[in-house]
Swiss-Prot record:
Cited InterPro entries: aa-tRNA-synth_II, aa-tRNA-synth_II/BPL/LPL, Anticodon-bd, Anticodon-bd_dom_sf, His-tRNA-ligase, HisRS-like_core, HisRS/HisZ, HisRS_anticodon
UniProt entry keywords in alphabetical sequence: Aminoacyl-tRNA synthetase, ATP-binding, Cytoplasm, Ligase, Nucleotide-binding, Protein biosynthesis
A single Gene Ontology CC term: cytoplasm
Annotated organism of origin: Alteromonas mediterranea (strain DSM 17117 / CIP 110805 / LMG 28347 / Deep ecotype)
Xref: NCBIfam families: hisS
Name of the protein in question: Histidine--tRNA ligase
Subunit structure as annotated in this protein's UniProt entry: Homodimer.
Record field: transmembrane: none
Molecular function terms from GO: ATP binding; histidine-tRNA ligase activity
Family statement: Belongs to the class-II aminoacyl-tRNA synthetase family.
Chief location of this protein within or outside the cell: cytoplasm
Length: 427
């Protein structure tokens, strides 16, 4: 027997038992962004490696350790996208979508990072993101946070996520703060772990993001960036906080929130939960006013966020009954004997025409009624349609409820759709 080939570690199949939950999640995400007037953008999975080196930063963990990079036959260095923002900016610059324009965009698709696989963190993962361009005031920061908050309300989990926000200030203010922070950290270098010492040399703000309890204790009294802001960034942040309060959005200012990508400035935020263990961040974003120019475009203000769909599905299945419904049919059409099969096809197609939102499955492969009804039960269908030679001759259909104790009835072909709709709507 040939050896069975398995999926690559950290890259998972989405099986039928959970794909329905994915579809519902994706549908809600699409509905919410559409209600805010956002438009979809789709970009390639593979991009030039330079795109991510220039945007994310060459000394970030993503570029140094996590990207899937290879040379094609022309010798060009290509990378499977590790995130979506850089691709959106590249596409916007390339197609003239950004200069002197306002854009509200969203995307959804697979991303790739060579990380250690664990619950809620995978090497291929799916990301939903929102990106806005051409608006520099705190009002658009507020809008993207309100939009993300509406996701949680739509899923019924708003009590299980919390908003954390911070500001990184301007590039100039952050550079001055960096010097202050480096001096503080070097005095405590003997209390830092290996990863933090590396970050101290390459990206010292990321030391503040350490999850090591010993490092957290060592930097507990580190100077806060929020105390070193330029006046304009402080006013921007103060206005955002005031408007979040006015909008009824509860939040916590987290001075240790810095985000792992180099392109952020001013507002950064995360939605976090206590329900997923170590992988507590379910949505994260912020402002990146310099990235468009950094990638060859004109200076353009921008703000956005992204969320991992795997992590969101995991959260929903943890907190709610979502995903527990494993049915994949509403109506199961049985047929006794080869003579009745053409009638079963006619009935199935007529119902699909009349009730396009109802899931209708027709039995194939023969077998007696007992076998067919057993199969109907496995699909989770609420109704079974019973068809034999007698029903075919009389142009009637037996309708057998499988779940709620209603009486079996026989109806004419012409009234079948109305009867099915009525019985499915009954509680």
């Amino acid at each position: 027997m040939a050896k069975t080939i398995q999926a690559i570690r950290g890259m998972n199949d989405c099986l039928p038992e959970i794909s329905g939950t994915w579809q519902k999640v994706e549908s809600v995400l699409r509905q919410v962004v559409a209600s805010y007037g956002y438009q979809e953008i789709r970009t390639p999975i593979v991009e030039s490696t330079d795109l991510f080196k220039r945007s994310i930063g060459e000394v970030t963990d993503i570029v140094e350790k996590e990207m899937y990079t290879f040379e094609d036959r022309n010798g060009d260095s290509l990378t499977l996208r590790p995130e979506g923002t850089a691709s959106c900016v590249r596409a916007g610059n390339e197609h003239g979508l950004l200069y002197n324009q306002q854009q509200r965009l969203w995307y959804m698709g697979p991303m790739f990072r060579h990380e250690r696989p664990q619950k809620g963190r995978y090497r291929q993962f799916h990301q939903f993101g929102v990106e806005t361009y051409g608006m520099d005031g705190p009002d658009i920061d507020l809008e993207v946070i309100l939009l993300s908050a509406r996701f949680w309300k739509s899923f019924g989990i708003e009590q299980h996520v919390k908003l954390q926000i911070n500001t990184l200030g301007s590039n100039e203010a952050r550079a001055a703060y960096r010097d202050t922070l480096v001096a503080f950290l070097k005095e405590r270098a003997d209390q830092l772990d290996e990863d933090s010492l590396r970050r101290l040399e390459t990206n010292p703000l990321r030391v503040l993001d350490s999850k090591n309890p010993d490092v957290q204790a060592a930097i507990a009294d580190a100077p806060a960036l929020i105390d070193h802001l330029d006046d304009e960034s402080k006013a921007h942040f103060d206005t955002l906080c005031a408007r979040l309060t006015q909008a009824g959005i509860e939040f916590e200012i987290n001075p240790r929130l810095v985000r792992g990508l180099d392109y952020y400035n001013r507002t950064v935020f995360e939605w976090v939960t206590d329900s997923l263990g170590a992988q507590g961040t379910v949505c994260a974003g912020g402002r990146y006013d310099g990235l468009v120019e950094q990638l060859g475009g004109k200076a353009t203000p921008a703000v956005g966020f992204a969320m991992g769909i795997e992590r969101l599905v995991l959260l929903l299945t943890t907190l709610t009954e979502e995903g527990q419904d494993t049915s994949f049919a509403d109506v199961y059409v049985t047929a006794m004997g080869d003579d009745a099969q053409p009638y079963a096809i006619e009935v199935s197609e007529a119902l699909r025409n009349a009730l396009p939102n109802i899931r209708i499955m027709m039995h194939c492969g023969g077998g007696n009624f007992k076998k067919q009804l057993k199969r109907a039960d496995k699909t989770g269908a609420r109704l079974a349609l019973l068809l034999g030679s007698d029903e075919m001759q009389s142009r009637e259909v037996g309708v057998k409820p499988l779940r709620d104790g209603q009486e079996q009835v026989t109806v004419s072909f012409d009234t079948l759709a109305d009867k099915v709709a009525e019985m499915l709507s009954a509680k």
